[in-house]
């Protein structure tokens, strides 16, 4: 899970094939009206979520959408809701899952360029919180691993580099450049 400030990007393996999904971050406080009963669907077409007693809904057009382009988003309710929303959009049946999420380099590393264990643990604790989905089963985050943004993109390339080669990764995100 690349839980960036403007989109959540998912990648998973299903039936031997890598699947991907991009889900925009646009959530407003409070729930939106559902259209249950107006379609043949057995579950509501809404995207209403609750976390720690706070209600949010996915709404790409709302002027009241919560701002996600700040560092505090990484540890916020909306970050967790956005991850769950992306999982719900993936088509994967709700179940316990293990995920890998990211932090911007400035949050992942401390002033000595070492992993900032306090921020990493804060991120893990945030993502493990329970999110309920109105009228539907929800995912349970069983295990969370945290990596610095941009670095996971190079894993496949790094294994094929020799000792004299190097790799530069430029991650142009919605609000950061790593």
Give the predicted meaning of each segment.
Residues 1-169:
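Nucleotide/phosphate-binding catalytic cleft detector across ATP-hydrolyzing
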Residues 166-178:
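Basic (Lys/Arg-enriched) interaction patch that binds polyanionic ligands
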């Amino acid at each position: 899970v690349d839980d960036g400030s403007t989109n959540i990007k998912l990648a998973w393996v299903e039936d031997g094939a890598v699947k991907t999904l991009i889900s925009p971050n646009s959530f407003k406080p409070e729930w939106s009206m559902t259209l249950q009963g107006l379609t043949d669907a057995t579950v509501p077409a809404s995207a209403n979520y609750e976390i720690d007693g706070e209600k949010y809904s996915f709404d790409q057009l709302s002027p009241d959408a919560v701002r996600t382009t700040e560092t505090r988003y990484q540890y916020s309710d909306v970050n967790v809701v956005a991850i769950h929303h992306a999982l719900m959009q993936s088509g994967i049946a709700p179940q316990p899952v293990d995920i890998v999420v990211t932090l911007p380099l400035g949050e992942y590393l401390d002033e000595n360029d070492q992993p900032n264990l306090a921020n990493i643990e804060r991120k893990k604790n945030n993502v493990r919180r329970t999110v309920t989905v109105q009228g539907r089963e929800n995912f349970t985050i069983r295990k969370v691993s945290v990596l610095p943004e941009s670095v996971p993109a190079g894993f496949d390339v790094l294994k094929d580099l020799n000792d004299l080669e190097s790799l530069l990764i430029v991650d142009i995100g919605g609000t950061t450049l790593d």
